[in-house]
């Protein structure tokens, strides 16, 4: 729900104990607080191909003060207002979005998020595909293709908190990984499925 960077957020955990944040949250100066990043993100979300729908949330998820979020919100709100006035996007509460979703989809539909340009100019592009059964991520970098994520969604898999309450200040919810480039990578080697061609050599 953060409005995560579809190209760079995923690898932002590699080699560290905690995953950093590259998202639309206005407190993050290199993303939600950066005009260049916000304009790129909005183009990716609102102009590039998707399936059933594309969406993002705006605002600040955690309790930061106005001083931390002022710059980012002053960048984002006028850009959203301009797209809203042109009829390019809807701006609504999460409650209304949930109602719209229920009215239009009896089950979770396939969706896709695409980022076909790279604001860092490192020749990366990505497609995230999601369905009620699985999610997968394709990453193109230069002339290579890597499947860096496939997670299966299985309602039969009970969470650790289904039969008993959590007793710590941290909860971990998981899905079934087929490929987990975030958790399985090191700083030296990014994990993923790569398409290879065998030559006579």
What are the residue ranges of the model-derived segments?
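Catalytic grooves of carbohydrate-active enzymes
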Residues: 1-97
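Acidic-aromatic substrate-binding/catalytic surfaces of carbohydrate-active enzymes
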Residues: 138-201
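Short, isolated positions within intrinsically disordered regulatory regions of eukaryotic proteins
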Residues: 41-44, 70, 132, 144, ...
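An acidic- and aromatic-residue-enriched active-site/binding cleft used to recognize and process polar
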Residues: 94-96, 134, 141-143
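Short, solvent-exposed loop/turn segments at secondary-structure junctions
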Residues: 60-64, 136, 143-144
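Surface beta-strand/loop "capping" patches
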Residues: 101-140
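A residue-identity detector for tryptophan
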Residues: 37-40, 66, 100, 128, ...
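A broad, low-specificity signal marking well-ordered, structured residues that form hydrophobic/aromatic
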Residues: 54-56, 89, 127-129, 136, ...
């Amino acid at each position: 729900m953060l409005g995560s960077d579809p190209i760079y957020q995923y690898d932002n955990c590699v080699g560290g104990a905690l995953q950093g944040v590259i998202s639309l949250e206005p407190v993050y100066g290199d993303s939600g607080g950066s005009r260049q990043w916000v304009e790129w993100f909005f183009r990716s979300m609102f102009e590039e191909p998707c399936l059933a729908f594309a969406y993002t949330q705006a605002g600040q998820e955690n309790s930061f003060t106005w001083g931390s979020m002022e710059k980012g919100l002053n960048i984002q709100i006028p850009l959203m207002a301009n797209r809203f006035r042109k009829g390019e996007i809807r701006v609504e509460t999460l409650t209304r979005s949930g109602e719209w979703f229920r009215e239009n989809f009896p089950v979770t539909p396939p969706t896709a998020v695409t980022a076909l340009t790279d604001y860092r100019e490192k020749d990366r592009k990505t497609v995230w595909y999601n369905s009620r059964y699985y999610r997968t991520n394709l990453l193109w970098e230069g002339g290579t293709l890597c499947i860096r994520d496939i997670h299966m969604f299985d309602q039969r898999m009970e969470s650790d908190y289904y039969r008993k309450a959590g007793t710590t200040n941290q909860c971990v919810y998981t899905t079934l990984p087929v490929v987990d480039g975030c958790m399985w990578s090191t700083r030296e080697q990014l994990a993923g499925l790569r398409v290879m061609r065998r030559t006579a050599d």
